[in-house]
């Protein structure tokens, strides 16, 4: 019997092609997701060297960052964005890579499309030229973002040079309170470990609270692993995983499905395996969370207050808090529930799935968006949009005063028409609150879909549990 292994090490070792003297490893890549922003130079590199895409059938492309979420019949107004999307179309056609075009109902955010199509599978190595590739770790896949030069390397060789990571376990036991979601879990974890806490590690999430999450919830948790500084996030696959994947287009079928299930059931950390770092948290202690500053680690319970830099002993941290509060235009000690907002964004690869929209619609039903707030709902894919519309969720949002959009990355980042104006404050279900992330001078508060809707209704950051019963 060999040494007990962690889930990460099982996947890593099964994909090793070669190990160099300095410890650098060549690993095989099972799946490669491609989008329009980080791929043009990679395809050009192949063209210049006369190379082909080695495994086009293990590659899937979709445009998401630059696509408009309003009337698509008018095309893409911004020239640079249009060129990038057109280049993805021509490059994938030239190199034989499957591409979900903008008018394809399967189009959407790459990290929502991959799982939806069954392209994401347990035990696989998955890469994409995008930091939030960690999302796919929810399936027990080793998934991480890569740079443009690495995109070219994977296209050409289906392999990648990497140094092995350390192992971190984040165990969250106990039951979640009513109104607390997967988004609150991961924000609380980042608040605990900081944005550098996971540096050099792959984080495995485990415990009763994690096992109790749906696949959508697990994807939300793994999505923001990168905001905790980690290389990737992992959750061991189980019956919830298998049920989600069954029958999806790229998932195994028939005897191959049964064989896959048998293998996937081995993808769990062995008893006695040792982690480099272990973090334990009580799910029952987690409240709805909200960020107050310009880093995902600047997070407090929604029932809390804006921190006072004077209470921080470390000069560097004190200065960082002061700078963040100046940018966010917040006063120390101010209750977070008194912070007024201008915009609400529900969507992104963190919270743009059908479960997120159902949770949001349940709170929006029978209520109205405040007159001072502009609120938009952006489904994560065409299939999510179709499902939501079949359930009447779009009508609930529209009647409440939300805008109902086409799928895309939208206001998560200022690379398309959906942006904040300088000084505008947004309650956002996305994953980053850096200065200017949603538009130059824009101020971002990261929240769950429930908090986002409640905030849209009251015009200030609000816990959905505190709302009066709706009339709907």
UniProtKB/Swiss-Prot annotation:
Cited function: Catalyzes the isomerization between 2-isopropylmalate and 3-isopropylmalate, via the formation of 2-isopropylmaleate.
Top-level EC class: lyase
Cofactor note: Binds 1 [4Fe-4S] cluster per subunit.
Disulphide linkage map: none
Protein name (database record): 3-isopropylmalate dehydratase large subunit
Alphabetized GO MF terms: 3-isopropylmalate dehydratase activity; 4 iron, 4 sulfur cluster binding; metal ion binding
Metabolic or biological pathway, per its Swiss-Prot or TrEMBL entry: Amino-acid biosynthesis; L-leucine biosynthesis; L-leucine from 3-methyl-2-oxobutanoate: step 2/4
Subunit composition and interactions: Heterodimer of LeuC and LeuD.
NCBIfam families: leuC, PRK05478.1, PRK12466.1
Binding site for [4Fe-4S] cluster: 349, 409, 412
């Amino acid at each position: 019997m060999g040494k007990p292994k962690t889930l990460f090490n099982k996947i890593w070792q099964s994909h090793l092609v070669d190990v160099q003297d300095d410890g650098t490893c060549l690993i095989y890549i099972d799946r490669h997701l491609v989008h329009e922003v980080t791929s043009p130079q990679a395809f050009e590199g192949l063209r210049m060297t006369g190379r082909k895409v080695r495994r086009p059938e293990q590659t899937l492309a979709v445009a998401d960052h630059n696509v408009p979420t309003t009337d698509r019949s008018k095309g893409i107004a911004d020239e640079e964005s249009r060129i990038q999307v057109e280049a993805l179309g021509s490059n994938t056609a030239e190199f034989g890579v499957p591409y979900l075009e903008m008018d394809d109902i399967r189009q959407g955010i790459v990290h929502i499309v991959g799982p939806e199509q069954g392209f994401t599978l347990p035990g696989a190595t998955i890469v994409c030229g995008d930091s939030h590739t960690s999302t796919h770790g929810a399936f027990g896949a080793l998934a991480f973002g890569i740079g443009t030069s690495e995109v070219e390397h994977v296209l050409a060789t289906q392999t990648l040079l990497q140094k092995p990571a350390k192992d971190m376990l984040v165990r969250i036991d106990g039951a979640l309170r009513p109104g607390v979601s997967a988004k609150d879990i991961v924000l609380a974890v980042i608040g605990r470990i900081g944005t550098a806490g996971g540096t050099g590690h792959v984080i495995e999430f485990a415990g009763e609270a994690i096992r109790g999450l749906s696949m959508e919830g697990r994807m939300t948790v793994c999505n923001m692993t990168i905001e905790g500084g980690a290389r990737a996030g992992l959750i061991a696959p189980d019956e919830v995983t298998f049920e989600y994947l069954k029958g999806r287009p790229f998932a195994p079928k028939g005897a191959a499905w049964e064989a896959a299930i048998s293998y996937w059931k081995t993808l769990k950390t062995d008893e006695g395996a040792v982690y480099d770092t272990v973090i334990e948290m009580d799910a029952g202690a987690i409240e709805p969370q909200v960020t107050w500053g310009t880093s995902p680690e600047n997070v407090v319970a929604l029932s809390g207050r804006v921190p006072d830099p004077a209470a921080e002993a470390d000069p560097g941290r004190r200065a960082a808090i002061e700078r963040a509060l100046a940018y966010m235009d917040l006063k120390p000690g101010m209750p977070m529930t008194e912070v007024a907002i201008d915009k609400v964004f529900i969507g992104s690869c963190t919270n743009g799935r059908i479960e997120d929209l159902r949770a949001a619609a349940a709170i929006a039903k029978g209520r109205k968006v405040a007159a001072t707030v502009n609120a938009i709902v952006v489904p994560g894919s065409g299939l999510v949009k179709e499902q939501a519309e079949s359930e009447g969720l779009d009508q609930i949002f529209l009647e409440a005063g939300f805008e109902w959009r086409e799928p895309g990355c939208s206001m998560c980042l200022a690379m398309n028409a959906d942006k904040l104006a300088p000084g505008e404050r947004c309650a956002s279900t996305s994953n980053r609150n850096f200065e200017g992330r949603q538009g130059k001078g824009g101020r971002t508060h990261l929240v769950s879909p429930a908090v986002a809707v409640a905030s849209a209704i009251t015009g200030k950051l609000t816990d959905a549990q505190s709302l009066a019963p709706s009339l709907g």
